[in-house]
Amino acid sequence: MAKTHSLSSKILIGLIRVYQVVISPLIGPRCRFTPTCSCYGIEAVKTHGAIKGSWLTLKRILKCHPLNAGGYDPVPPKINNKKEKK
């Protein structure tokens, strides 16, 4: 079953895709991480929603600089804190 996303999530994902298609080819590959920051952003928004996904993406972008070694840094899994009803 396909997961539906909010309008804000769809807009954020669309903006990231525009960056990937229009801006990223002009500046070349610069990301120090796997997956790239833009792919991370899309996955974070899909997994955690617009607000938390944006926060995770912002933290990731702030870590992507020459003084950080980078490497493999996946999106953290969504934790379900709801207790099962008996």
Curated annotation (Swiss-Prot):
Where's it found, cell-wise? Answer: Cell inner membrane
Q: Which organism is it from?
A: Pasteurella multocida (strain Pm70)
Q: What is the first-listed, main subcellular location in coarse terms?
A: membrane
| Keyword list, A-Z | Cell inner membrane, Cell membrane, Membrane
Question: Which InterPro entries did the record assign?
Answer: Membr_insert_effic_factor_YidD
Similarity-based family: Belongs to the UPF0161 family.
Its record classes its membrane topology as: Peripheral membrane protein
Query: What role does it play?
Result: Could be involved in insertion of integral membrane proteins into the membrane.
Q: Which cysteines are joined by disulfide bonds?
A: none
Record's protein name: Putative membrane protein insertion efficiency factor
Annotated Gene Ontology cellular component terms: plasma membrane
Q: Does the keyword Membrane apply?
A: yes
Q: What is the lineage of its organism?
A: Bacteria, Pseudomonadati, Pseudomonadota, Gammaproteobacteria, Pasteurellales
